[in-house]
Amino acid sequence: MTAGHGAQEWDSRYAGSDRVWSAAPNAWVAATLREWFTGRALDLGTGEGRHAVWLAALGWRVTAVDFSTVGIERGRAGAQDVGVEVDWVVSDVRTWEPTAGETFDLVLVAYLHLEDDVLARARTWLAPGGALVVVGHALRNLTEGVGGPQDARLLHTEAEYREASRGLVVEQLGEVVRHLPDGDAIDLALVARRPWGDQ
């Protein structure tokens, strides 16, 4: 999801092709989460649900949120194809809130580019020991990489990710380069964990 594009625009985009994104998870997401112990996961801005379905196949209990009805329907079909259960929620991540008292062992935010402070809200939904895992296009990608939003306000810096994870223990923060046929894309990745003793 990108700011400036509403649910109708994303519905049209998803309806216009077989898949907008790959059905496989992002390589960095897969490498980072593949060996983690499973629990409750939230995929915020799930799009067509590729990460939600992949996490569910690993054994996570997943809630996936996106404002695109078409994207959610694609995710639902993908989950059915591989025989996994996901709690699909059609809602705008800028206003969605979990049920009172509901927390997650993992909040995944992949390529969600908004001006709203979604990450700061997402960190409050972590269970003790839970992790906020974020990957998106880095600000440097605008001038030195390929793809992604062409609006600097929607791209991120390490300082912004650090601020968004205030109160969490940052385990990983830095750029990740994806080699694509038309050049390199520069992403920014974060893993930040709520301390176990934080009640």
Protein language model regions, located:
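Conserved class I S-adenosyl-L-methionine
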Residues: M1-F37, G39-G47
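Conserved SAM/SAH-binding beta-strand->alpha-helix loop
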Residues: S68-V70
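Conserved SAM-binding strand-loop segment of SAM-dependent methyltransferases
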Residues: D81-V93
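A short acidic, Gly/Pro-enriched loop at the edge of an enzyme's catalytic core
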Residues: P98-L106
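A short, conserved alpha-helix within the catalytic core of class I
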Residues: H113-W125
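Conserved beta-strand signature within the Rossmann-like core of class I S-adenosyl-L-methionine
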Residues: G129-H137
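Short alpha-helix
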Residues: R153-G167, L173
